[in-house]
């Protein structure tokens, strides 16, 4: 009986392992999810009609005409007349709609404005090491979402899935990146990965949003390569690493087939670090330049 139970458990474990999706299947699923995030979900990135980035002390007013979803825009003039007024003071966001206060919890979830129009806000880094808020206006009929043809990736190539040695940086210093909006954004250099690809030894820095080892559950590389601006997005691409357990890992798996473009490749409403680190290869893996792919 005991042996039978062990065999049954072992078979179940084998079947679970056997049923685990292959890397290429995960990649395909990720592309489908990315298409949804860009254009299909209620708060899809390409449904953003306007954005306001607030530093402490800033005020923004949402102007527009009822019944005209495309008319809603933010005004930095505190004297402007509009349906929504947002202020950030001492790190606290306050919002009023037609003069009535909006609950703080609603700001991060959904503030209805008009047919097909709502507003959502979240804390974000508005300058290097400076926290503020980002407020988006979503329009369900926004043309960019309607005309979206889907993301385009190079065909999956298992050669671009590599095992890498990770060397942590004990100091985890801050590094400031220029962004697509002309501002600065701060990340922490948490270490370097070393791997071999196409016969070349490559070292690539890794960055995280925190320098506290207890809070580091993932990190990313912002890289350029020989295809940057020549079939791959001109400001570089990103690749994320997670599922390594406790930081720091000794080795990690990097699948460059999952390398993706920053949101800024398709929308001006995000602040994305411009990649500075180089891979001296033509990386025919990951997402293509959206401006030339279709």
Where are these regions (language model features)?
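Acidic, glycine-rich flexible loop segments
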Residues: 222-258
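Surface-exposed beta-loop interaction hotspot
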Residues: 126-187
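Bacterial N-terminal signal peptides
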Residues: 8-15
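Forkhead-associated
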Residues: 48, 53-108
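Positively charged n-region of N-terminal signal peptides that target proteins for export
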Residues: 1-5
